[in-house]
Amino acid sequence: MRPLSARPRLSLPTLACGALLCACGGPTSTPAEKAAADSAPAADTGPSGPQPWTRALPASALSFPAVRGWETRRLIVHLHSPWSHDACDGNGFEEGVLNEPCLQDLRAGLCDAGVDLAFVTDHPAHAAYQPYDQLWHSRDGDQPLLDGGAAIGNTISCADGRPLHWMPGIEDELMPIGLRAHVRADPVENDVMYNRFDAEAIDAVEAVGALPFIAHTEQRQLDSLRAQVEAGVVGVELFNLHAAFDPDLRDEFLGLERADWLGAIAPMTAPTGTAEPDLFMLAVLREQTPSVGLWDALNTELDVVGVAGTDAHQNVLPTSLRDGERGDSYRRMLRWFNNEVRVPAAEADDPLAWRRALAAGRAAVVFELLGTPVGWDVRVEGSRTLELGETAPWTDHPGASLQVDCPRLAAASPKGDEAPEIDAVVFKDGVEWARGCGAHPLDGPGAYRVRFDVVPHHLRPFLGDDPAPWLIAYPWIYTNPIRLRAAGR
């Protein structure tokens, strides 16, 4: 694995040239096999008919109808504040002065993206040396996020009055999220420990209440990941936004063309383009096969949560696009995708419960730039109902079925007159096993998960003068698995 300090960041001049000056064109991928759209009537109560593009997302409580009594909340995992040395165009914290405008961009972006809880994960070069209670950048009007009377984060009041919660963490060789204290009293020792990824480092972050995750799964090996999970790592990234764009990471680790997306995004980013600027991520929205494969392999034996890492730094493209906002704004990147968790209605307002739901794998990765999905559900119906993230003995569930309820597009989602095409692909131990909505009788032990794909015909009005190349199948939702283990596993 390449050390974090050696991992390249995107080249600003290269990106600016590719994004703003190259000729127009769509992506080069061809449509994937797809099934008919789910035609169930919508249960949400938003407006009907075409809806304009919106730079912000409504609060979760307004976006997601309850599913079997479960409420949905949006979480962001892997995000950088001015405490990261490479954030804010490399000027997050210079000569003892914090970049306040960049911090305000981050706070506003989280609110605009409808985020409920952000696990901010700063690099240790600066963060390890800050007092723990400075990691969440509290400002006037904020309230401490408390657990047992101790502050473990921050609560920001967004402009619409809803709360946004912030928990601190670190991203280096490990990515502990939700730190409740620094691992050591001495800042230098913090820095050293945060740069390690062995069992002692995992124990150290667990001892201060953090959930140990692994970022940049694409750069890892299965044997080392397995050892880290056995030592206490809770989850891994199945998608990382930095890797999706970075030419070197695409080429070396993802097996993708280095920079074919650069020319493709001109309809969204060029001054003469006619497509919605927010949609330029479609050019890189592809399954990150190495990361997903490692995650699947781990889940054949172990319980491993999968998340998507936003990895936003606001440090790549300061040039404004046609909407007047810099190309890599926090707001834009945070709107693209999130990690949804399901919690009981009684815990709908409890960020600590959302954290527990993520740790349990009662969660899914959702690419909400494709639209807000509502009504989807995946569960095992057997001797009892098994939810996402659960593990149970196969012998306890004879005759069980995997019930797959496909998503619908929320009524308030940006859309034209056309309906999306939605498909459900069921994977068992990482291999496609079934397809389609409905009940799928289980045929043996395995880790069962679902990927919902969408061909976004509903986005045609926002895709410029030549929308056809963009109307292909994209991953919309990755659920975490439900695991049924054989005897002795």
Where are these regions (language model features)?
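Bacterial N-terminal signal peptides
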Residues: 11-23
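C-terminal functional module detector
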Residues: 46-72, 76, 80, 84, ...
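Flexible, glycine-rich surface segments
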Residues: 270-274, 278-282, 303, 361-362, ...
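N-terminal secretory signal peptides that target proteins for export/translocation
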Residues: 1-8
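Mixed-charge, low-complexity intrinsically disordered segments
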Residues: 262-266
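Ser/Thr-rich, Pro/Gly/Ala-heavy low-complexity intrinsically disordered linkers and tails
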Residues: 1, 22-48
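Short secondary-structure transition/capping segments
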Residues: 4, 130-133, 225-227, 319-320, ...
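A metal-dependent hydrolase metal-coordination microenvironment
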Residues: 52-260, 272, 276, 285-293, ...
